[in-house]
Protein backbone atom coordinates (compact mmCIF):
# COMPACT_ATOMS: atom_id res chain seq x y z
CA UNK A 1 0.00 0.00 0.00
CA UNK A 2 1.13 3.53 -0.68
CA UNK A 3 2.07 5.68 2.30
CA UNK A 4 0.15 8.87 3.10
CA UNK A 5 3.17 10.87 1.90
CA UNK A 6 3.12 9.09 -1.48
CA UNK A 7 -0.58 9.80 -1.88
CA UNK A 8 -0.02 13.46 -1.08
CA UNK A 9 2.78 13.56 -3.65
CA UNK A 10 0.28 12.40 -6.28
CA UNK A 11 -2.39 14.92 -5.27
CA UNK A 12 -0.76 17.92 -6.94
CA UNK A 13 -0.15 16.29 -10.33
CA UNK A 14 -3.60 14.72 -10.12
CA UNK A 15 -5.30 18.08 -9.62
CA UNK A 16 -3.25 19.61 -12.42
CA UNK A 17 -4.38 16.81 -14.73
CA UNK A 18 -7.99 17.34 -13.64
CA UNK A 19 -7.68 21.05 -14.47
CA UNK A 20 -6.15 20.10 -17.83
CA UNK A 21 -9.12 17.84 -18.59
CA UNK A 22 -11.57 20.67 -17.80
CA UNK A 23 -9.67 23.12 -19.99
CA UNK A 24 -9.58 20.66 -22.89
CA UNK A 25 -13.34 20.22 -22.56
CA UNK A 26 -13.73 24.01 -22.52
CA UNK A 27 -11.77 24.23 -25.79
CA UNK A 28 -14.78 22.79 -27.63
CA UNK A 29 -17.20 25.51 -26.47
CA UNK A 30 -17.94 28.91 -28.06
CA UNK A 31 -16.73 30.33 -31.36
CA UNK A 32 -14.90 33.67 -31.36
CA UNK A 33 -15.23 35.05 -34.89
CA UNK A 34 -12.58 37.74 -35.01
CA UNK A 35 -9.58 37.34 -32.70
CA UNK A 36 -8.73 33.65 -33.02
CA UNK A 37 -9.52 33.71 -36.72
CA UNK A 38 -7.15 36.63 -37.22
CA UNK A 39 -4.19 34.80 -35.65
CA UNK A 40 -4.75 31.74 -37.83
CA UNK A 41 -5.34 33.84 -40.94
CA UNK A 42 -1.91 35.43 -40.45
CA UNK A 43 -0.27 32.01 -40.53
CA UNK A 44 -2.48 31.01 -43.48
CA UNK A 45 -1.39 34.07 -45.41
CA UNK A 46 2.31 33.43 -44.94
CA UNK A 47 1.88 29.73 -45.66
CA UNK A 48 0.34 30.70 -49.02
CA UNK A 49 3.50 32.65 -49.80
CA UNK A 50 2.63 36.23 -48.88
CA UNK A 51 5.56 38.34 -47.73
CA UNK A 52 5.87 39.86 -44.25
CA UNK A 53 5.54 43.65 -44.22
CA UNK A 54 5.11 43.76 -48.00
CA UNK A 55 1.76 41.98 -48.28
CA UNK A 56 0.58 42.11 -44.64
CA UNK A 57 0.20 45.51 -42.98
CA UNK A 58 -0.59 44.72 -39.36
CA UNK A 59 1.97 44.90 -36.56
CA UNK A 60 0.77 41.60 -35.06
CA UNK A 61 2.42 39.81 -38.00
CA UNK A 62 5.73 39.84 -36.12
CA UNK A 63 4.75 36.76 -34.15
CA UNK A 64 3.09 34.89 -37.03
CA UNK A 65 6.25 32.88 -37.94
CA UNK A 66 5.86 31.04 -34.62
CA UNK A 67 2.51 29.70 -35.86
CA UNK A 68 3.82 28.40 -39.18
CA UNK A 69 5.19 25.05 -37.87
CA UNK A 70 1.87 24.31 -36.19
CA UNK A 71 -0.11 25.43 -39.23
CA UNK A 72 2.02 23.43 -41.68
CA UNK A 73 1.84 20.33 -39.48
CA UNK A 74 -1.94 20.52 -39.24
CA UNK A 75 -2.29 20.85 -43.00
CA UNK A 76 0.10 17.94 -43.52
CA UNK A 77 -1.99 15.77 -41.18
CA UNK A 78 -5.47 16.77 -42.35
CA UNK A 79 -4.83 18.03 -45.88
CA UNK A 80 -6.57 21.34 -45.12
CA UNK A 81 -7.70 23.68 -42.38
CA UNK A 82 -10.73 21.77 -41.11
CA UNK A 83 -10.77 21.85 -37.31
CA UNK A 84 -7.71 24.07 -36.97
CA UNK A 85 -9.47 26.39 -34.49
CA UNK A 86 -9.90 23.53 -32.01
CA UNK A 87 -6.40 22.21 -32.69
CA UNK A 88 -4.90 25.63 -31.89
CA UNK A 89 -6.85 25.83 -28.64
CA UNK A 90 -5.74 22.35 -27.59
CA UNK A 91 -2.11 23.13 -28.48
CA UNK A 92 -2.19 26.30 -26.37
CA UNK A 93 -3.66 24.49 -23.36
CA UNK A 94 -1.09 21.68 -23.60
CA UNK A 95 1.80 24.16 -23.78
CA UNK A 96 0.42 26.05 -20.79
CA UNK A 97 0.04 22.79 -18.87
CA UNK A 98 3.68 21.94 -19.56
CA UNK A 99 4.76 25.29 -18.09
CA UNK A 100 2.46 24.88 -15.08
CA UNK A 101 3.66 21.33 -14.38
CA UNK A 102 7.32 22.38 -14.59
CA UNK A 103 6.54 25.25 -12.23
CA UNK A 104 4.90 22.84 -9.79
CA UNK A 105 7.99 20.65 -9.76
CA UNK A 106 10.24 23.69 -9.27
CA UNK A 107 8.23 25.13 -6.36
CA UNK A 108 7.55 21.77 -4.72
CA UNK A 109 10.28 22.33 -2.05
CA UNK A 110 8.30 25.40 -0.91
CA UNK A 111 5.39 23.13 -0.01
CA UNK A 112 2.80 21.17 -1.94
CA UNK A 113 0.00 23.66 -1.38
CA UNK A 114 2.06 26.66 -2.40
CA UNK A 115 3.39 24.93 -5.51
CA UNK A 116 -0.06 23.69 -6.52
CA UNK A 117 -1.74 27.08 -6.10
CA UNK A 118 0.98 28.86 -8.10
CA UNK A 119 0.90 26.31 -10.93
CA UNK A 120 -2.90 26.25 -11.13
CA UNK A 121 -3.06 30.04 -11.28
CA UNK A 122 -0.59 29.97 -14.18
CA UNK A 123 -2.54 27.17 -15.89
CA UNK A 124 -6.10 28.53 -15.71
CA UNK A 125 -5.17 32.04 -16.86
CA UNK A 126 -5.90 33.26 -20.38
CA UNK A 127 -5.91 36.93 -21.28
CA UNK A 128 -9.61 37.90 -21.46
CA UNK A 129 -10.42 34.22 -21.91
CA UNK A 130 -9.11 34.23 -25.49
CA UNK A 131 -8.37 30.72 -26.72
CA UNK A 132 -5.84 29.49 -29.22
CA UNK A 133 -2.30 30.51 -30.08
CA UNK A 134 -2.69 34.26 -29.71
CA UNK A 135 0.31 36.54 -29.35
CA UNK A 136 -0.86 37.09 -25.77
CA UNK A 137 -0.62 33.39 -25.00
CA UNK A 138 2.72 32.82 -26.74
CA UNK A 139 4.25 35.91 -25.12
CA UNK A 140 3.01 34.64 -21.74
CA UNK A 141 4.49 31.20 -22.38
CA UNK A 142 7.82 32.48 -23.68
CA UNK A 143 8.33 34.95 -20.84
CA UNK A 144 7.15 32.49 -18.20
CA UNK A 145 9.47 29.79 -19.53
CA UNK A 146 12.37 32.22 -19.41
CA UNK A 147 11.62 33.09 -15.78
CA UNK A 148 11.44 29.39 -14.89
CA UNK A 149 14.82 28.78 -16.53
CA UNK A 150 16.27 31.62 -14.47
CA UNK A 151 14.79 30.02 -11.36
CA UNK A 152 16.51 26.73 -12.14
CA UNK A 153 19.75 28.55 -12.96
CA UNK A 154 19.93 30.09 -9.49
CA UNK A 155 20.83 26.78 -7.85
CA UNK A 156 22.76 24.85 -10.48
CA UNK A 157 26.43 24.33 -11.21
CA UNK A 158 28.19 27.08 -13.14
CA UNK A 159 28.34 25.16 -16.44
CA UNK A 160 24.66 24.28 -16.38
CA UNK A 161 23.83 27.78 -15.19
CA UNK A 162 25.38 29.31 -18.29
CA UNK A 163 23.35 27.02 -20.53
CA UNK A 164 20.12 27.79 -18.68
CA UNK A 165 20.76 31.54 -18.87
CA UNK A 166 21.50 31.25 -22.60
CA UNK A 167 18.23 29.35 -23.10
CA UNK A 168 16.35 31.91 -20.99
CA UNK A 169 17.70 34.75 -23.12
CA UNK A 170 16.69 32.96 -26.31
CA UNK A 171 13.15 32.12 -25.26
CA UNK A 172 12.51 35.54 -23.74
CA UNK A 173 13.69 37.15 -26.97
CA UNK A 174 10.74 35.39 -28.60
CA UNK A 175 8.49 37.14 -26.09
CA UNK A 176 9.87 40.46 -27.38
CA UNK A 177 8.77 39.49 -30.89
CA UNK A 178 5.23 39.10 -29.54
CA UNK A 179 5.39 42.39 -27.59
CA UNK A 180 8.26 44.60 -28.85
CA UNK A 181 7.96 47.01 -25.91
CA UNK A 182 9.43 44.27 -23.70
CA UNK A 183 12.81 45.12 -25.19
CA UNK A 184 13.03 47.94 -22.64
CA UNK A 185 13.58 45.32 -19.92
CA UNK A 186 16.91 44.38 -21.53
CA UNK A 187 18.28 47.68 -20.24
CA UNK A 188 18.62 46.01 -16.82
CA UNK A 189 21.19 43.33 -17.76
CA UNK A 190 23.12 45.85 -19.85
CA UNK A 191 23.30 48.27 -16.91
CA UNK A 192 24.38 45.41 -14.64
CA UNK A 193 27.34 44.68 -16.90
CA UNK A 194 28.51 48.28 -16.52
CA UNK A 195 28.51 48.21 -12.72
CA UNK A 196 31.93 47.81 -11.03
CA UNK A 197 30.36 45.41 -8.52
CA UNK A 198 29.46 43.05 -11.39
CA UNK A 199 33.11 42.04 -11.82
CA UNK A 200 33.38 38.27 -11.71
CA UNK A 201 29.61 37.77 -12.02
CA UNK A 202 29.08 38.79 -15.61
CA UNK A 203 29.10 35.27 -17.07
CA UNK A 204 25.39 34.40 -16.61
CA UNK A 205 24.33 37.85 -17.82
CA UNK A 206 26.51 37.56 -20.91
CA UNK A 207 25.06 34.10 -21.54
CA UNK A 208 21.55 35.55 -21.28
CA UNK A 209 22.37 38.33 -23.74
CA UNK A 210 24.06 35.78 -26.00
CA UNK A 211 20.87 33.72 -26.08
CA UNK A 212 18.88 36.84 -26.90
CA UNK A 213 21.25 37.70 -29.73
CA UNK A 214 21.19 34.16 -31.13
CA UNK A 215 17.38 34.07 -31.19
CA UNK A 216 17.26 37.52 -32.77
CA UNK A 217 19.68 36.45 -35.51
CA UNK A 218 17.63 33.35 -36.33
CA UNK A 219 14.43 35.39 -36.51
CA UNK A 220 16.02 38.09 -38.68
CA UNK A 221 17.51 35.45 -40.95
CA UNK A 222 14.04 33.99 -41.53
CA UNK A 223 12.56 37.44 -42.13
CA UNK A 224 15.27 38.61 -44.54
CA UNK A 225 15.09 35.28 -46.36
CA UNK A 226 11.43 36.04 -47.12
CA UNK A 227 11.73 39.76 -47.85
CA UNK A 228 14.64 42.03 -48.73
CA UNK A 229 15.76 44.74 -46.33
CA UNK A 230 14.94 47.47 -48.85
CA UNK A 231 11.39 46.16 -49.34
CA UNK A 232 10.93 45.85 -45.59
CA UNK A 233 11.99 49.45 -44.99
CA UNK A 234 9.86 50.65 -47.90
CA UNK A 235 6.69 49.10 -46.51
CA UNK A 236 7.32 49.62 -42.79
CA UNK A 237 5.58 53.05 -42.74
CA UNK A 238 2.39 51.41 -44.06
CA UNK A 239 2.51 48.77 -41.33
CA UNK A 240 2.88 51.50 -38.71
CA UNK A 241 -0.28 53.19 -40.03
CA UNK A 242 -2.26 50.53 -38.14
CA UNK A 243 -5.57 52.27 -37.22
CA UNK A 244 -5.95 50.10 -34.12
CA UNK A 245 -2.74 51.39 -32.58
CA UNK A 246 -2.98 53.39 -29.37
CA UNK A 247 -3.04 57.17 -29.78
CA UNK A 248 -2.39 57.82 -26.08
CA UNK A 249 0.98 59.39 -25.27
CA UNK A 250 3.68 57.25 -23.65
CA UNK A 251 3.80 59.25 -20.37
CA UNK A 252 0.04 58.89 -19.95
CA UNK A 253 0.23 55.14 -20.61
CA UNK A 254 3.05 54.79 -18.08
CA UNK A 255 1.03 56.72 -15.49
CA UNK A 256 -2.00 54.53 -16.13
CA UNK A 257 0.15 51.45 -15.66
CA UNK A 258 1.16 52.64 -12.19
CA UNK A 259 -2.34 53.71 -11.18
CA UNK A 260 -4.30 50.74 -12.55
CA UNK A 261 -3.85 48.33 -9.60
CA UNK A 262 -5.06 51.00 -7.18
CA UNK A 263 -7.98 51.97 -9.40
CA UNK A 264 -9.11 48.41 -10.09
CA UNK A 265 -9.25 47.63 -6.37
CA UNK A 266 -10.23 51.05 -5.10
CA UNK A 267 -13.14 49.66 -3.06
CA UNK A 268 -10.76 47.72 -0.81
CA UNK A 269 -8.01 50.34 -0.90
CA UNK A 270 -8.76 51.57 2.61
CA UNK A 271 -7.94 48.11 3.96
CA UNK A 272 -5.07 46.81 1.83
CA UNK A 273 -3.63 50.23 1.06
CA UNK A 274 -3.87 51.28 4.70
CA UNK A 275 -2.12 48.09 5.82
CA UNK A 276 0.72 48.64 3.34
CA UNK A 277 1.11 52.30 4.31
CA UNK A 278 1.17 51.43 8.00
CA UNK A 279 3.69 48.64 7.36
CA UNK A 280 6.02 51.12 5.72
CA UNK A 281 5.62 53.88 8.31
CA UNK A 282 5.41 52.06 11.65
CA UNK A 283 8.94 50.59 11.61
CA UNK A 284 10.33 54.11 11.20
CA UNK A 285 8.13 55.47 13.97
CA UNK A 286 8.99 52.58 16.30
CA UNK A 287 12.64 52.67 15.23
CA UNK A 288 12.81 48.98 14.33
CA UNK A 289 14.36 47.31 11.30
CA UNK A 290 11.23 45.74 9.81
CA UNK A 291 7.53 45.09 10.31
CA UNK A 292 8.38 41.61 11.60
CA UNK A 293 9.95 43.29 14.66
CA UNK A 294 6.70 45.01 15.65
CA UNK A 295 4.58 43.61 18.50
CA UNK A 296 2.47 40.55 17.64
CA UNK A 297 -0.76 42.47 18.22
CA UNK A 298 0.23 45.09 15.65
CA UNK A 299 1.20 42.43 13.10
CA UNK A 300 -2.12 40.63 13.58
CA UNK A 301 -3.93 43.91 13.00
CA UNK A 302 -1.96 44.61 9.82
CA UNK A 303 -2.61 41.09 8.54
CA UNK A 304 -6.32 41.39 9.34
CA UNK A 305 -6.59 44.65 7.40
CA UNK A 306 -4.73 43.13 4.45
CA UNK A 307 -6.98 40.05 4.48
CA UNK A 308 -10.07 42.26 4.62
CA UNK A 309 -8.80 44.14 1.58
CA UNK A 310 -8.03 40.84 -0.13
CA UNK A 311 -11.61 39.66 0.45
CA UNK A 312 -13.07 42.91 -0.92
CA UNK A 313 -10.76 42.71 -3.93
CA UNK A 314 -11.93 39.19 -4.75
CA UNK A 315 -15.58 40.14 -4.31
CA UNK A 316 -15.18 43.07 -6.72
CA UNK A 317 -13.13 41.20 -9.33
CA UNK A 318 -16.26 40.65 -11.42
CA UNK A 319 -15.86 38.80 -14.70
CA UNK A 320 -12.30 39.88 -15.47
CA UNK A 321 -9.91 36.94 -15.55
CA UNK A 322 -6.68 38.02 -13.88
CA UNK A 323 -8.11 40.25 -11.17
CA UNK A 324 -7.92 37.45 -8.61
CA UNK A 325 -4.26 37.08 -9.56
CA UNK A 326 -3.71 40.77 -8.82
CA UNK A 327 -5.52 40.41 -5.48
CA UNK A 328 -3.08 37.68 -4.45
CA UNK A 329 -0.12 39.76 -5.64
CA UNK A 330 -1.18 42.71 -3.48
CA UNK A 331 -1.59 40.43 -0.48
CA UNK A 332 1.88 39.03 -1.22
CA UNK A 333 3.43 42.48 -0.82
CA UNK A 334 1.93 42.70 2.65
CA UNK A 335 3.08 39.17 3.39
CA UNK A 336 6.63 40.07 2.36
CA UNK A 337 6.70 42.98 4.81
CA UNK A 338 5.37 40.83 7.66
CA UNK A 339 7.92 38.06 7.07
CA UNK A 340 11.32 38.27 8.84
CA UNK A 341 13.98 39.20 6.25
CA UNK A 342 15.87 35.94 6.74
CA UNK A 343 12.73 33.88 6.00
CA UNK A 344 11.56 35.70 2.89
CA UNK A 345 11.40 33.71 -0.40
CA UNK A 346 13.89 35.98 -2.14
CA UNK A 347 14.54 33.65 -5.07
CA UNK A 348 10.84 33.39 -5.94
CA UNK A 349 10.38 37.15 -5.58
CA UNK A 350 13.33 37.94 -7.86
CA UNK A 351 12.62 35.26 -10.46
CA UNK A 352 8.82 35.52 -10.71
CA UNK A 353 7.18 38.27 -8.68
CA UNK A 354 9.13 41.36 -9.73
CA UNK A 355 9.57 40.30 -13.39
CA UNK A 356 5.86 39.48 -13.53
CA UNK A 357 4.95 43.00 -12.43
CA UNK A 358 7.39 44.47 -14.95
CA UNK A 359 5.86 42.26 -17.65
CA UNK A 360 2.38 43.55 -16.78
CA UNK A 361 3.47 47.20 -16.76
CA UNK A 362 4.99 46.83 -20.22
CA UNK A 363 1.77 45.29 -21.54
CA UNK A 364 -0.22 48.23 -20.19
CA UNK A 365 2.07 50.65 -22.03
CA UNK A 366 2.48 48.65 -25.23
CA UNK A 367 -1.05 47.38 -25.81
CA UNK A 368 -4.39 49.05 -26.48
CA UNK A 369 -6.28 46.47 -24.39
CA UNK A 370 -6.14 48.37 -21.11
CA UNK A 371 -5.97 46.65 -17.75
CA UNK A 372 -6.66 43.19 -19.15
CA UNK A 373 -3.24 43.31 -20.83
CA UNK A 374 -1.61 43.92 -17.46
CA UNK A 375 -3.12 40.74 -16.05
CA UNK A 376 -0.66 38.72 -18.15
CA UNK A 377 2.04 39.89 -15.78
CA UNK A 378 0.03 39.34 -12.61
CA UNK A 379 -0.60 35.71 -13.60
CA UNK A 380 3.14 35.07 -13.88
CA UNK A 381 3.82 37.07 -10.71
CA UNK A 382 1.62 34.62 -8.81
CA UNK A 383 4.43 32.07 -9.12
CA UNK A 384 6.22 34.29 -6.62
CA UNK A 385 3.16 35.64 -4.80
CA UNK A 386 1.97 32.22 -3.60
CA UNK A 387 5.31 31.39 -1.90
CA UNK A 388 5.44 34.91 -0.41
CA UNK A 389 2.00 34.54 1.17
CA UNK A 390 2.72 30.99 2.27
CA UNK A 391 6.03 31.97 3.90
CA UNK A 392 4.37 34.83 5.77
CA UNK A 393 1.59 32.73 7.28
CA UNK A 394 4.02 29.92 8.11
CA UNK A 395 6.33 32.31 9.99
CA UNK A 396 3.45 33.97 11.85
CA UNK A 397 2.25 30.54 12.94
CA UNK A 398 5.71 29.37 13.99
CA UNK A 399 6.37 32.40 16.16
CA UNK A 400 2.95 32.25 17.81
CA UNK A 401 1.44 35.39 16.28
CA UNK A 402 -1.18 33.07 14.78
CA UNK A 403 -2.35 29.72 16.08
CA UNK A 404 -1.00 26.90 13.90
CA UNK A 405 -4.48 25.79 12.86
CA UNK A 406 -5.43 29.37 12.06
CA UNK A 407 -2.30 29.83 9.95
CA UNK A 408 -2.89 26.63 8.00
CA UNK A 409 -6.56 27.49 7.47
CA UNK A 410 -5.73 31.01 6.27
CA UNK A 411 -3.05 29.68 3.92
CA UNK A 412 -5.47 27.18 2.41
CA UNK A 413 -8.15 29.85 2.06
CA UNK A 414 -6.10 32.65 0.50
CA UNK A 415 -4.44 30.26 -1.95
CA UNK A 416 -7.52 28.23 -2.91
CA UNK A 417 -10.07 31.00 -3.41
CA UNK A 418 -8.16 32.82 -6.23
CA UNK A 419 -7.65 29.47 -7.95
CA UNK A 420 -11.34 28.58 -7.73
CA UNK A 421 -12.50 32.05 -8.79
CA UNK A 422 -10.09 32.18 -11.74
CA UNK A 423 -10.99 28.63 -12.74
CA UNK A 424 -14.68 29.50 -12.77
CA UNK A 425 -14.01 32.62 -14.85
CA UNK A 426 -11.99 30.60 -17.37
CA UNK A 427 -14.52 27.78 -17.69
CA UNK A 428 -17.89 29.48 -17.35
CA UNK A 429 -17.39 32.83 -19.06
CA UNK A 430 -16.99 33.37 -22.79
CA UNK A 431 -15.09 35.68 -25.08
CA UNK A 432 -17.15 37.12 -27.94
CA UNK A 433 -19.91 34.64 -28.54
CA UNK A 434 -22.99 33.93 -26.45
CA UNK A 435 -23.49 32.46 -22.96
CA UNK A 436 -22.54 28.78 -22.80
CA UNK A 437 -26.16 27.74 -22.31
CA UNK A 438 -26.95 29.06 -25.80
CA UNK A 439 -24.00 27.35 -27.53
CA UNK A 440 -25.83 24.17 -28.46
CA UNK A 441 -24.95 23.72 -32.13
CA UNK A 442 -21.77 21.83 -33.08
CA UNK A 443 -19.95 23.00 -36.22
CA UNK A 444 -19.01 20.13 -38.53
CA UNK A 445 -17.21 21.75 -41.47
CA UNK A 446 -14.47 24.28 -42.08
CA UNK A 447 -11.77 25.71 -39.81
CA UNK A 448 -14.02 25.85 -36.73
CA UNK A 449 -15.25 22.25 -37.00
CA UNK A 450 -15.68 20.71 -33.57
CA UNK A 451 -16.70 23.92 -31.78
CA UNK A 452 -20.12 24.54 -30.29
CA UNK A 453 -21.85 27.87 -30.87
CA UNK A 454 -25.37 29.25 -31.15
CA UNK A 455 -27.69 27.91 -33.87
CA UNK A 456 -27.77 31.40 -35.39
CA UNK A 457 -23.99 31.65 -35.60
CA UNK A 458 -23.77 28.09 -36.91
CA UNK A 459 -26.12 28.95 -39.78
CA UNK A 460 -24.17 32.13 -40.57
CA UNK A 461 -20.89 30.21 -40.45
CA UNK A 462 -22.13 27.54 -42.87
CA UNK A 463 -23.44 30.20 -45.27
CA UNK A 464 -20.08 31.99 -45.34
CA UNK A 465 -18.23 28.74 -45.97
CA UNK A 466 -20.60 28.00 -48.85
CA UNK A 467 -20.29 31.51 -50.32
CA UNK A 468 -16.50 31.27 -50.53
CA UNK A 469 -16.05 27.63 -51.51
CA UNK A 470 -18.81 27.91 -54.11
CA UNK A 471 -17.16 30.78 -55.99
CA UNK A 472 -15.63 29.90 -59.37
CA UNK A 473 -13.13 32.77 -59.21
CA UNK A 474 -9.54 31.97 -58.27
CA UNK A 475 -8.31 35.54 -57.75
CA UNK A 476 -7.87 37.41 -54.46
CA UNK A 477 -10.73 37.39 -51.96
CA UNK A 478 -11.80 40.04 -49.44
CA UNK A 479 -14.14 39.57 -46.46
CA UNK A 480 -15.36 42.43 -44.30
CA UNK A 481 -14.41 42.85 -40.67
CA UNK A 482 -15.79 40.19 -38.36
CA UNK A 483 -14.89 36.98 -40.20
CA UNK A 484 -11.12 36.74 -40.73
CA UNK A 485 -11.54 32.99 -40.23
CA UNK A 486 -13.28 32.92 -43.62
CA UNK A 487 -9.93 33.29 -45.38
CA UNK A 488 -9.09 29.80 -44.09
CA UNK A 489 -11.93 28.34 -46.18
CA UNK A 490 -9.97 28.79 -49.40
CA UNK A 491 -6.38 28.89 -50.62
CA UNK A 492 -7.04 31.92 -52.78
CA UNK A 493 -4.79 34.96 -52.19
CA UNK A 494 -5.93 37.48 -49.61
CA UNK A 495 -7.08 40.72 -51.20
CA UNK A 496 -6.72 42.99 -48.17
CA UNK A 497 -3.97 44.85 -46.35
CA UNK A 498 -4.64 42.66 -43.31
CA UNK A 499 -7.12 40.05 -42.18
CA UNK A 500 -7.87 42.06 -39.04
CA UNK A 501 -11.19 43.95 -39.13
CA UNK A 502 -10.93 45.63 -42.49
CA UNK A 503 -13.91 47.80 -43.43
CA UNK A 504 -15.14 49.01 -46.81
CA UNK A 505 -14.12 52.57 -45.95
CA UNK A 506 -10.64 51.67 -44.70
CA UNK A 507 -8.16 54.37 -45.68
CA UNK A 508 -5.42 51.77 -45.90
CA UNK A 509 -7.22 49.82 -48.62
CA UNK A 510 -6.84 52.54 -51.23
CA UNK A 511 -3.13 52.88 -50.41
CA UNK A 512 -2.71 49.10 -50.40
CA UNK A 513 -4.25 48.62 -53.85
CA UNK A 514 -2.06 51.39 -55.27
CA UNK A 515 0.97 49.49 -53.97
CA UNK A 516 -0.43 46.07 -54.94
CA UNK A 517 -2.85 46.46 -57.88
CA UNK A 518 -2.67 42.68 -58.44
CA UNK A 519 -4.28 42.20 -55.01
CA UNK A 520 -7.53 43.96 -55.87
CA UNK A 521 -10.09 41.27 -54.97
CA UNK A 522 -11.95 39.19 -57.53
CA UNK A 523 -14.47 38.24 -54.85
CA UNK A 524 -15.71 40.53 -52.09
CA UNK A 525 -18.01 39.30 -49.33
CA UNK A 526 -19.74 42.20 -47.57
CA UNK A 527 -21.31 40.75 -44.45
CA UNK A 528 -24.57 42.06 -43.04
CA UNK A 529 -24.19 43.99 -39.81
CA UNK A 530 -25.89 41.27 -37.76
CA UNK A 531 -23.51 38.53 -38.90
CA UNK A 532 -20.91 37.36 -36.39
CA UNK A 533 -21.89 39.81 -33.68
CA UNK A 534 -21.45 38.48 -30.18
CA UNK A 535 -23.85 38.97 -27.29
CA UNK A 536 -21.50 38.20 -24.40
CA UNK A 537 -17.85 38.80 -23.59
CA UNK A 538 -15.56 39.28 -20.62
CA UNK A 539 -14.50 42.84 -21.45
CA UNK A 540 -17.04 44.52 -23.73
CA UNK A 541 -15.61 47.95 -22.95
CA UNK A 542 -12.39 47.23 -24.86
CA UNK A 543 -13.95 47.72 -28.29
CA UNK A 544 -16.77 50.27 -28.56
CA UNK A 545 -17.81 49.03 -32.02
CA UNK A 546 -16.97 45.32 -31.85
CA UNK A 547 -19.90 44.18 -33.95
CA UNK A 548 -19.54 46.57 -36.87
CA UNK A 549 -19.06 44.61 -40.08
CA UNK A 550 -18.84 46.64 -43.24
CA UNK A 551 -18.27 50.36 -42.68
CA UNK A 552 -19.74 53.21 -44.70
CA UNK A 553 -21.51 52.23 -47.91
CA UNK A 554 -19.84 55.14 -49.70
CA UNK A 555 -16.37 53.92 -48.77
CA UNK A 556 -13.55 53.55 -51.27
CA UNK A 557 -14.03 49.85 -51.95
CA UNK A 558 -17.79 50.11 -52.48
CA UNK A 559 -17.36 52.86 -55.06
CA UNK A 560 -14.50 51.05 -56.77
CA UNK A 561 -16.52 47.84 -57.10
CA UNK A 562 -19.33 49.79 -58.77
CA UNK A 563 -16.88 51.55 -61.09
CA UNK A 564 -15.38 48.21 -62.18
CA UNK A 565 -18.78 46.69 -62.82
CA UNK A 566 -18.69 43.88 -60.25
CA UNK A 567 -21.79 41.69 -60.15
CA UNK A 568 -23.54 41.55 -56.74
CA UNK A 569 -25.24 38.39 -55.47
CA UNK A 570 -27.34 38.31 -52.33
CA UNK A 571 -26.65 35.53 -49.81
CA UNK A 572 -28.15 34.78 -46.37
CA UNK A 573 -25.18 36.52 -44.72
CA UNK A 574 -24.55 39.47 -47.00
CA UNK A 575 -23.65 40.45 -50.54
CA UNK A 576 -21.02 38.76 -52.69
CA UNK A 577 -19.43 40.88 -55.43
CA UNK A 578 -17.73 38.94 -58.23
CA UNK A 579 -15.49 40.24 -61.00
CA UNK A 580 -17.05 39.81 -64.42
Per-region residue spans from a language model:
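Short hydrophobic alpha-helices at membrane interfaces in multi-pass membrane enzymes
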Residues: 149-174, 200-210, 300-303, 348-356
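Short acidic/glycine- and proline-prone juxtamembrane loop motifs at membrane-interface regions
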Residues: 131-140
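Short periplasmic/luminal acceptor-recognition loop of GT-C membrane glycosyltransferases, typified by
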Residues: 58, 421-504, 522-536, 572-578
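Transmembrane-helix signature of polytopic, membrane-embedded enzymes
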Residues: 98-124
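Perimembrane helix-loop-helix junctions
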Residues: 155, 184-224, 285-288, 398
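Short hydrophobic/aromatic helix or loop-helix immediately within or flanking a transmembrane segment
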Residues: 40-44, 55-80, 175
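Membrane-interface alpha helices of multi-pass inner-membrane proteins
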Residues: 127, 149, 162-180, 186-191, ...
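Membrane-interface transmembrane helices that cradle and orient dolichyl/undecaprenyl
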Residues: 109, 113, 144-167, 199, ...
Amino acid sequence: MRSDSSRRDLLGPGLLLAALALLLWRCTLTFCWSDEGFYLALAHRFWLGDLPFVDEWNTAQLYAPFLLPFYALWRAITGGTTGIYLAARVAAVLLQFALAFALYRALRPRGRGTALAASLLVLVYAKAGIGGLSYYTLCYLFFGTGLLLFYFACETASTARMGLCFAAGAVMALAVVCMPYLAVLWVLPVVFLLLPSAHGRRGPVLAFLGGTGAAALVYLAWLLHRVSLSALLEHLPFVLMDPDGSSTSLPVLALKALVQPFYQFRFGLLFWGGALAASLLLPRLRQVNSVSALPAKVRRLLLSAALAGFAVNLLTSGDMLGKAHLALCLLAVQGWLLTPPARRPVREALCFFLPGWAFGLVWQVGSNTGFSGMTLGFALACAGAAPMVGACLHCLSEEGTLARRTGRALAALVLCVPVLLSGWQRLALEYRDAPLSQCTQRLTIGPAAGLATTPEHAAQYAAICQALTGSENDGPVFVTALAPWAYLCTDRPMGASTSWRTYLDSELLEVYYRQHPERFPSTVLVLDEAVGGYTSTLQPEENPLPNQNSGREDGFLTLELARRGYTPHTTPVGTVYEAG
